[in-house]
Amino acid sequence: MYAVASIPFTDLGQVKKLIIKSAAAGADFVELRLDYWTRKETPPFLEMIELARNYGLDVIVTVRDPEEGGVWSPPWRGEAYEMASEAGAVCDVEVKKFKELPCDRAILSVHYFRKPPREGEVRKLSQRALEAGAWAFKVATVVTDFPSYFLLFSESVHPRTAFMPMGEGTEALRLASALLGSFLNYGSVGEATAPGQVSVRQLTKALSALGGRGD
């Protein structure tokens, strides 16, 4: 199980500060949310990958589709994933839309902002991710209580499944994800990138208490 610091990629100076802050908070990964970069030119994120690695952090590159919570659909999305792949980073793409895995280590993800997935949907999508050879499968969903959340979690057939409950008042469920064995656990070091997101420091404390860092 790993702690991931999700960083909106806006201003380079701010991104640098948040990477350093993520390392100090005990994160294992930083997620660079490139869809926050609202310029037409490709963001200069390769130097940020190098900086993160200098601080002992692995890197996830995400250009989230607007239909699943992204800021916008940039013209350089494909190019950014190619660059991330060449740099050896993890790439996060939507399981419902991908045609081929953009990186050797790819996360196939799905997001439900209005209501939880139908029964069996997580099983179907996780099976697709597994058969595609995805490094991990991620589900972010609105949820109201622990029993329904546990049922959704238990549907996944992918051995590396990350679950993120979303919505107001789900902070405790976020921390409980580690108890269920969520492979990746996302937190913030500044601006939250998802509703209900807790801080990375809270996550690392929870994971350390469980003695469950790593695979």
UniProtKB/Swiss-Prot annotation:
Residue sites binding 3-dehydroquinate per the record: 6, 31-33, 64, 174, 193, 197
GO biological process: 3,4-dihydroxybenzoate biosynthetic process; amino acid biosynthetic process; aromatic amino acid family biosynthetic process; chorismate biosynthetic process
Active site: 111 (proton donor/acceptor), 138 (schiff-base intermediate with substrate)
One term of GO molecular function: 3-dehydroquinate dehydratase activity
Catalytic activity, as annotated: 3-dehydroquinate = 3-dehydroshikimate + H2O
Annotated metabolic or biological route of this protein: Metabolic intermediate biosynthesis; chorismate biosynthesis; chorismate from D-erythrose 4-phosphate and phosphoenolpyruvate: step 3/7
Pfam family, one: DHquinase_I
CDD domains per record: DHQase_I
Major enzyme class: lyase
Enzyme Commission no: 4.2.1.10
Keywords from the UniProt entry: Amino-acid biosynthesis, Aromatic amino acid biosynthesis, Lyase, Schiff base
Domain of life: Archaea
Family: Belongs to the type-I 3-dehydroquinase family.
Job of this protein: Involved in the third step of the chorismate pathway, which leads to the biosynthesis of aromatic amino acids. Catalyzes the cis-dehydration of 3-dehydroquinate (DHQ) and introduces the first double bond of the aromatic ring to yield 3-dehydroshikimate.
Subunit structure: Homodimer.
Protein name as annotated: 3-dehydroquinate dehydratase
Organism, scientific name: Ignicoccus hospitalis (strain KIN4/I / DSM 18386 / JCM 14125)
Gene name of the encoded protein: aroD
